[in-house]
Amino acid sequence: MKKFNKDIGTYCENLACDYLIKNNFKILECNFKNRLGEIDIISIRNSILIIIEVKGRYNYEFGVPKESVSVSKQKNIIKVTKSYINYKKLYNFNVRFDVIEVYLNKIDSSYKINHIKDAFRT
């Protein structure tokens, strides 16, 4: 089950990247990892550094995807973001935290993307 969830997560992140590129976002990193944690997607658009958490679901059994980005998860993303900014020396950017929800259809290969801009703040 763990590998299945990881595969679904990777698939959803790829769909999210495609969506972002089609909407004129510049992708800087996918799956950035350091000792503090991971950020799914780091992008830039209109001089804003955008940190994106991707969540995918087949159904609402466990709630809508955004609900799984808990306060502790948000704090961890913020901590990793600060580390990334220092590492890459990206001090002159405003930062925004988004969530991209990917709703997958079990019957066919269709999907729906919901991009929640400014989903949480520092």
UniProtKB/Swiss-Prot annotation:
It holds the Pfam family UPF0102. Belongs to the UPF0102 family. GO terms for molecular function: nucleic acid binding. HAMAP family: UPF0102. It comes from Clostridium botulinum (strain Alaska E43 / Type E3). This is UPF0102 protein CLH_1204. Disulfide bonds: none annotated. InterPro entries: Restrct_endonuc-II-like, tRNA_endonuc-like_dom_sf, UPF0102_YraN-like. PANTHER family: UPF0102 PROTEIN YRAN (PTHR34039:SF1). It comes from the Bacteria.
